[in-house]
Amino acid sequence: MKPPIFIIIMSTVISGTVIVMTSSHWMLTWIGFEMNMLAIIPILMKKFNPRAMEASTKYFLTQATASMLLMMGIIINLLHSGQWTVSNNLNPMASILMTTALAMKLGLAPFHFWVPEVTQGISLSSGMILLTWQKIAPLSILYQISPTINPHLLLPMAILSVLIGGWGGLNQTQLRKIMAYSSIAHMGWMAAILLYNPTMMFLNLIIYITMTLTTFMLFMLNSATTTLSLSQTWNKAPLITSLILTLMLSLGGLPPLSGFTPKWMIIQELTKNEMIILPTFLAITALLNLYFYMRLTYATALTMFPSTNNMKMKWQFESTKKTIFLPPLIIISTMMLPLTPMISILD
């Protein structure tokens, strides 16, 4: 893709998200979602091959269905209230339709089926955008309508997402699918806390985006897409490989890494709201995520997968440019736990 075209498309993607976040009119919000969806599809098809086309088609069909449900919810709310203003005073039926539509856009279970398939079919850079930037707009609308969301709809979605996010990643060898299932689980954690402390949901989102962004950037630097290719990068770039493994443990929520911070704070907040079963279930299902990350770390760090390639050193090295943002991102993604008392004001 030529740089001027890429800049125009990325500007449209960013503009769509900003319009969704800043508009107070439901029609403008819907237009922002459409701008964002139509602009991201050429980015997903950047590598023009059948798998990318299939992934883009799946993404388009899912997002178009979600947009249709969102518009239905907007129209029902308009008929009930007579206004287009984005507010937390929604008709119950409109709230259910909007929550379902935004759950489809986010990839919350049971609408999660498109996330692993689409992520696997596109390039690492496109997957990075899909699993980070594309989560901001739907979550910002959920944040705005959180007082009217039906907990009997959202909390089962949250529990199912955390469960499927851990279960689905157990037998995966493709790194992009592992990141996709991790994304589903993290969205479940955010949905669980949304009804009780929406601000903490945004804190969780920031930490998740930072960790996922850093992990994908290191994957691109290492050209790693499978567990086999990751295990073969020790001779090529041992420092980057060890950083990837540390980040994966952070994504799994292993203390004392940064990924433990949002889980700790969410469980604490749910307990303060006299929820016992939900945080217990979330903590137990989070072990599934941690298990497959630790298994991947063990397999990569302490064993070597069978390979037909007998070369220990890859003769061709990737370019090491564009790493200026990596050091601060790596520090934030792994060492933020000591700063937790500073952000406890959100409680």
Curated annotation (Swiss-Prot):
Superkingdom classification of source: Eukaryota
GO MF: NADH dehydrogenase (ubiquinone) activity
BP GO terms, sorted: mitochondrial electron transport, NADH to ubiquinone; mitochondrial respiratory chain complex I assembly
Membrane topology annotation: Multi-pass membrane protein
Keywords: Electron transport, Membrane, Mitochondrion, Mitochondrion inner membrane, NAD, Respiratory chain, Translocase, Transmembrane, Transmembrane helix, Transport, Ubiquinone
InterPro entries, per the entry: Complex_I_Subunit_2 (IPR050175), NADH_DH_su2_C (IPR010933), NADH_UbQ_OxRdtase_chain2 (IPR003917), ND/Mrp_TM (IPR001750)
Enzyme Commission code(s) on record: 7.1.1.2
GO cellular component, one term: mitochondrial inner membrane
Localization terms from the record: Mitochondrion inner membrane
Top-level enzyme category: translocase
Coiled coil regions in record: none
Pfam family, one: NADH_dehy_S2_C
Catalysis performed (reactions): a ubiquinone + NADH + 5 H(+)(in) = a ubiquinol + NAD(+) + 4 H(+)(out)
Residue ranges crossing the lipid bilayer per the database entry: 3-23, 25-45, 59-79, 96-116, 122-142, 149-169, 178-198, 201-221, 237-257, 274-294, 323-343
Primary location recorded for the protein, binned into one broad class: mitochondrion
Family of this protein: Belongs to the complex I subunit 2 family.
Quaternary structure note: Core subunit of respiratory chain NADH dehydrogenase (Complex I) which is composed of 45 different subunits. Interacts with TMEM242.
Functional description taken from the UniProt entry: Core subunit of the mitochondrial membrane respiratory chain NADH dehydrogenase (Complex I) which catalyzes electron transfer from NADH through the respiratory chain, using ubiquinone as an electron acceptor. Essential for the catalytic activity and assembly of complex I.
Record protein name field: NADH-ubiquinone oxidoreductase chain 2
Protein species of origin: Viverra tangalunga
